[in-house]
Amino acid sequence: GKRTAGVDGIKLLTPQQRIKLVNQLKITGKSQPTRRVMIPKPGTNESRPLGIPTMYDRALQAVVKAALEPEWEAKFEPNSYGFRPGRSCHDAIGAIFLSIRYKAKYVLDADIAKCFDRINHKALLDKINTYPRLQKQIKSWLKSGVLDQGEIFPTKEGTPQGGVISPLLANIALHGMEERIKQFAGKSINQRREISLIRYADDF
């Protein structure tokens, strides 16, 4: 999606244009619709919808992400590995190995179908609970709509795959999943300790 244009038709910027864009960035609580682009899913005949923001919105999303990420990195569960700085799928594999190394365990391998597309906007915004201006801007991106074949459709749920801030928003939405599952595992502390939930984005 990096070299795909949004509704502004811009794919790349020169260094001079980037400097000019940075000087224009301002949190206004407004945004442009994303542009729908379909890309093939590896190993299947299905396609995945991307929502490509304008170049301006991409740059502003990077700024807002830089403001939010440190706070949430301090909160995120230690066994969450996807879309996080300094972490990779190899770290997730290592965590799985350590979890099953000394004792046989049942393993449930699952992923959340269409996770990005089904995130509840109100629940996510309530969870973020940041400064009003940032909150308004994030809500604007979530509600910006999507341009598909010349027609703009409303976005009532989800965060567009293709947005700079979307992976962080998805991780925020899924934060607390491990603790919630452990609450249903059993009443005793030992029963809860027996469960390891190792998550890489929407795969766990």
Locations of regions flagged by a protein language model:
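Non-catalytic, polymerase-adjacent accessory regions of viral genome-replication enzymes
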Residues: G1-L21
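Glycine-rich active-site/cofactor-binding loop and its immediate structural neighborhood
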Residues: P40, T44-P53, Q61
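Short glycine-rich loop/turn motifs
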Residues: P33-R36, P49
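Charged boundary/loop elements
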Residues: G1, A66-G82
